[in-house]
From Swiss-Prot:
One of its GO terms (biological process) is methylation. It comes from Methanosarcina mazei (strain ATCC BAA-159 / DSM 3647 / Goe1 / Go1 / JCM 11833 / OCM 88). Pfam families: MtrA (PF04208). Belongs to the MtrA family. One of its GO terms (molecular function) is methyltransferase activity. The lineage of its organism: Archaea, Methanobacteriati, Methanobacteriota, Stenosarchaea group, Methanomicrobia. Its EC number is 2.1.1.-. May be part of a complex composed of 3 subunits; MtxA, MtxH and MtxX. This is Putative methyltransferase Mtx subunit A. It comes from the Archaea. It is an enzyme of class 2 (transferase). InterPro entries: MeTrfase_MtrA/MtxA. Keywords: Methyltransferase, Transferase.
Length: 172
């Protein structure tokens, strides 16, 4: 279940529950989490749409139309509807595995719970193994000389958590 920009209490009967406010990373995270569980066959998109980003509209568009060669979500009107961290294969798996239920604008917790109850036991598990997507983290290069370590690892080593670099304590 995707609650978009709304803050709604979690529904214990939903296999997965969370908000999404962006049409790129938010959509990517939904896809990666859904395809990692072959038992998820329905995704309820509800709550208030995020202005400008249109995460809900983009999720509907990627499910219906996929992405082009540049990773743009075909048919999305979001501000930056580009998928950069998952493959077209992962998008296709999402399209095949789930049915997306468009209830954008629905904020009534009781109606949402009813929909979850109606769909939680429908359908068989997707007939393929879960798909795991691992994207390498993009690392920012730091040219600054550290002046302090904000994480003490031991009496001998400290780490600058912003740069992600470990130093000997005596070098600072």
């Amino acid at each position: 279940m995707v609650t978009l920009a709304s803050h709604l209490d979690a529904c214990p009967d939903a296999a997965i529950w969370g908000s999404s406010k962006t049409e790129n990373l938010g959509v990517e995270k939904i896809i990666v989490n859904v395809i990692s569980n072959s038992n998820i066959r329905y995704v309820l998109v509800c709550g208030t749409e995020s202005r400008g980003h249109l995460a809900g509209h983009s999720l509907l568009a990627i499910h219906a139309n996929g992405i082009d060669e540049q990773g743009r979500i075909t048919g999305s009107q979001g501000a930056i509807p580009f998928i950069e961290n998952i493959s077209g294969t992962a998008v296709e798996r999402f399209q095949q595995q789930v049915t997306v239920l468009n209830r954008i604008g629905l904020n009534d917790p009781e109606e949402i719970r009813r929909i979850v109850e109606d769909y939680r036991d429908k359908g068989e598990a997707y007939p393929e193994e879960p798909m795991l997507v691992c994207a390498p983290k993009k690392r920012q290069t730091s040219f600054a000389v550290p002046t302090s370590g904000d994480v003490i690892i031991s009496g001998e080593f400290v780490m600058d958590s912003k740069a992600g670099i470990i130093y000997t304590a005596e070098s600072l």
